[in-house]
């Protein structure tokens, strides 16, 4: 029994780590064209319909961009065209402060990753598609490399997970 106790104590953290509650149920990015994100370019995310119906989720928007992005913010529309009635929300993302220091994570010369909560949404059986469109005055945004969404069970968003 004395041999078993130290072994059990050493193994306990591994057992507990396996019990972590991962609340993320969907997390995907779409790559933006290297020529830029055109206003007409809709980034679409098809949700597996059997998993997400009639639940409330925290929606999070993720962006990856370079220093070539010319603005400190980004306006986007979050569209759920199959929702009844169709839903469209506008979101303002502040990517840099007034002095030009980028928010989010990244190194100083290549790629930055930014996450922002976009509110709670309840998905119905018809909600199988979420779309992102930029609403900036410029018809083509250079420097945005990827945009994505994350759906998590409400009350437990972990923006550090699954980078």
Model regions and ranges:
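Short beta-strand-plus-loop segments that form exposed binding edges in beta-rich domains
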Residues: 62-65, 131-138
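Bacterial N-terminal signal peptides that target proteins for export
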Residues: 1-8
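C-terminal motif of bacterial Sec signal peptides marking the signal peptidase cleavage site
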Residues: 15-18
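Post-signal-peptide N-terminal segment of Sec-exported extracytoplasmic proteins
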Residues: 39-71
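An anionic, turn-rich surface loop/hairpin at beta-sheet edges
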Residues: 91-122
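Bacterial signal peptide processing site
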Residues: 20-23
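Exposed low-complexity, polar/acidic, P/S/T/G-rich flexible segments that act as propeptides
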Residues: 77-81, 137-163
